[in-house]
Amino acid sequence: IICDEYKYLWQGIGKADSIVFNPHKWLGAQFDCSVHFLKDMNVQKNTLSLTPEYLKTSGVEGITNLSDYTIPLGRRFRALKLWFLIRSEGLSGIRKLIRDHINWSEELFHKIKLLKNIEVITEPVLGLFTFRFINQNSENINELNEKIVKEINDEGLIYLTPTKVGEKLVIRFMAGTLEMEENDIDVAYECIKEKSERT
């Protein structure tokens, strides 16, 4: 929602009761940092609030007790991580990070779909896409991909995660770390290309 060109992906979001996203997964905030938007905060308050006599605030109306919105009565100050990220990178820096990651992922997607022994499973959405290695001589393509993901991750140049699309074990690619640079896409491409040539 921070980049205008991707706001179309949020169409219909007004029908949702809540939205959660994790800035520690993509935006570079320190772990753990989640953001939770609620349409009606009273629903969560009614679910989670615990008000024994010793916690009641008498004679004061309209006080928001944040302990009413979480299971524990106290809260860590997680918002500070996000505040520091926004202060250090700025909204323009965060937008650039998102745009770069999406563009770099799309660039990699278009390169690897031309490789032999690669089957693209899903197109990139916000920089995330899936693919798998194929080999007509392999009896079990899922096992082949599981083995290749382990090899790639053990080498330590890039890190990929497997998932399932239907019954197919596929490989997820997502550009998404604060320190990532454009040449890291070249490293990922060479790594995937080398495996596709050996498959």
Please state what every model-predicted region is:
Residues 2-3, 9-113:
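Active-site C-terminal subdomain of aminotransferase-like
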Residues 25, 88-91, 135-137, 177-181:
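A generic structural motif
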Residues 84-85, 130-133, 171-176:
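Short, hydrophobic beta-strand segments
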Residues 107, 111-115, 147-158, 191, ...:
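Generic non-transmembrane alpha-helical segments
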Residues 115-123, 162-163:
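Flexible, glycine/charged-enriched surface loops at secondary-structure junctions
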Residues 119-152:
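Conserved PLP-binding catalytic core of the aspartate aminotransferase-like
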Residues 165-199:
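PLP-dependent enzyme catalytic core of the Aspartate aminotransferase-like
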